[in-house]
C-alpha cells in the first residue's frame, strides 16, 4: 500500500496527461484520415479509447479559475450544438481546445502530417492495386461530357480530393518557413494529378487560392497583411450573398453554380425552404426536402447553428488576426 501511495505522489501526472492527449489527438486524426464517419462502428470503437485518453488529460491538468469558467462555457456551447444539430464537430473541437493545455502544437501538427501522409498513401496505392475499392464512377465535366473519376477507397471523389487537400495543407503549414518555388511546383503537381482523378473543381480552386494567400503573405508589407485577416469574413459574405441571391435564370450565377458543382443551388434551396434562425436548429428539419450535402462551412454553420454562432467565429478570427 505504501508503494502505491508513493507511486501516486511521485509520478509526473502532467506528463501522463500530455501523452494521453497525444493519443486522443492521434486517434481522431487517424479516423478522419481513413475517411471513417461518426456513424461507423469502427469509429465508435476507437472513439471510446479517445475519450478515455481525453478524460485522463483533463483530470491530470491544473486549470486556473478563469480557465475553468471558459471550459464550462465551451462545453455548454458544444453540448448544446451537439444535442440540437445532431453534429459532434463543434463539441470535439471545443474538447480538443480545452485539453490542449501544456501540449506542443508543433508536435501535434507533426503527428497529423505523418498520419495523413501514411493513410493517404495506403488508400491510394491499395485501391490502385485492387486491395481496396477504387470507387470508379463517371461525372459530367464543364462541357457536360461524362468523364471517369475515382474515390480511392473513400466515400466520394470529392472526399478523396479533400483528403489530398488537407494533407498538402498540413505539409505546407509544417514546412512554412521552407516554402519556395519547388514546394509550389511539387504540391501543385500533386493537386492537379488528383484533380484529374476526382474532378473536384472547387477543391483545386481553393488549393491555388491558398497558395495565392501564402505568396501574398511572403511578399506583402505588414500594413497590407490585413487582407489575410479579412479573407475569412469576405469569404463568409460572398457565400452568404450567393446563397441569398442565387437565380438559376441568370447566366453568370448559373455558370458560377456549375463551376462549384451545384453547391450554390443546394445552399439556396435550403435557405428558400427552411429560412434562417438566430439559434441552432434540429437537423431533422432539413430531412423533409433533401437537396444535397452543404459542404460550405460558412453556410453549414449559418443554416444549422444559427446566425449568432455563425457570426461569432469570423468576428473572433478577424479580431485575433488583425495586425
Task: Locate predicted features.
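Transmembrane signal-anchor hairpin modules in multi-pass inner-membrane enzymes, especially those
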Residues: 1-76, 176-177
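Membrane-interface micro-motifs in multi-pass membrane enzymes
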Residues: 34-49, 132, 145-166, 200, ...
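Transmembrane alpha-helical segments and their membrane-water interfaces
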Residues: 77-120, 215, 316
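Alpha-helical transmembrane segments of multi-pass inner-membrane proteins
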Residues: 113-131, 156-198, 204-212
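Membrane-interfacial helix-loop-helix modules of multi-pass inner-membrane proteins that assemble, modify
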Residues: 121-157, 254-255
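A membrane-periplasm/extracellular boundary helix in multi-pass inner-membrane enzymes
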Residues: 218-254
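TM-adjacent membrane-interface loops and short helices in multi-pass inner/ER membrane proteins
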Residues: 264-292, 305-311
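Conserved small/polar residues in nucleotide/adenosyl-binding loops
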Residues: 318-323
Amino acid at each position: 500500500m505504501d508503494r502505491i501511495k508513493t507511486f501516486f505522489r511521485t509520478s509526473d501526472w502532467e506528463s501522463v496527461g500530455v501523452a494521453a492527449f497525444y493519443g486522443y489527438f492521434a486517434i481522431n486524426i487517424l479516423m478522419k484520415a481513413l475517411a471513417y464517419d461518426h456513424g461507423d462502428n469502427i469509429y465508435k470503437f476507437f472513439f471510446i479509447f479517445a475519450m478515455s485518453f481525453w478524460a485522463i488529460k483533463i483530470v491530470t491538468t491544473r486549470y486556473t479559475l478563469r480557465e475553468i469558467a471558459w471550459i464550462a462555457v465551451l462545453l455548454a456551447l458544444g453540448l448544446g450544438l451537439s444535442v440540437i444539430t445532431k453534429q459532434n464537430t463543434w463539441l470535439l473541437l471545443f474538447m480538443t481546445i480545452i485539453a490542449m493545455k501544456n501540449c506542443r502544437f508543433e508536435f501535434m501538427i507533426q503527428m497529423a502530417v505523418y498520419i495523413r501522409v501514411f493513410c493517404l498513401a495506403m488508400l491510394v496505392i491499395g485501391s490502385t492495386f485492387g486491395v481496396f475499392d477504387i470507387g470508379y464512377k463517371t461525372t459530367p465535366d464543364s462541357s457536360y461530357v461524362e468523364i471517369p473519376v475515382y474515390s480511392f477507397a473513400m466515400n466520394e471523389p470529392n472526399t478523396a480530393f479533400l483528403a489530398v487537400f488537407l494533407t498538402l495543407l498540413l505539409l505546407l503549414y509544417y514546412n512554412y518557413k521552407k516554402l519556395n518555388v519547388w514546394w509550389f511546383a511539387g504540391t501543385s503537381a500533386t493537386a492537379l494529378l488528383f484533380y484529374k482523378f476526382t474532378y473536384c473543381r472547387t477543391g483545386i480552386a481553393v488549393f491555388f487560392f491558398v497558395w495565392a494567400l501564402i505568396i501574398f503573405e511572403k511578399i506583402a508589407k505588414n500594413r497590407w497583411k490585413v487582407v489575410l485577416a479579412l479573407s475569412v469574413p469576405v469569404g463568409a459574405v460572398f457565400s452568404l450573398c450567393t446563397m441569398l441571391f442565387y437565380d438559376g435564370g441568370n447566366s453568370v450565377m448559373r455558370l458560377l453554380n456549375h463551376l462549384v458543382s451545384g453547391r450554390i443551388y443546394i445552399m439556396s434551396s435550403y435557405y428558400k425552404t427552411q429560412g434562417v434562425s438566430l439559434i441552432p436548429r434540429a437537423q431533422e428539419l432539413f430531412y423533409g426536402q433533401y437537396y444535397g450535402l452543404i459542404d460550405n462551412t460558412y453556410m453549414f454553420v449559418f443554416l444549422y447553428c444559427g446566425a449568432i454562432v455563425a457570426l461569432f467565429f469570423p468576428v473572433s478570427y478577424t479580431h485575433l488576426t488583425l495586425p
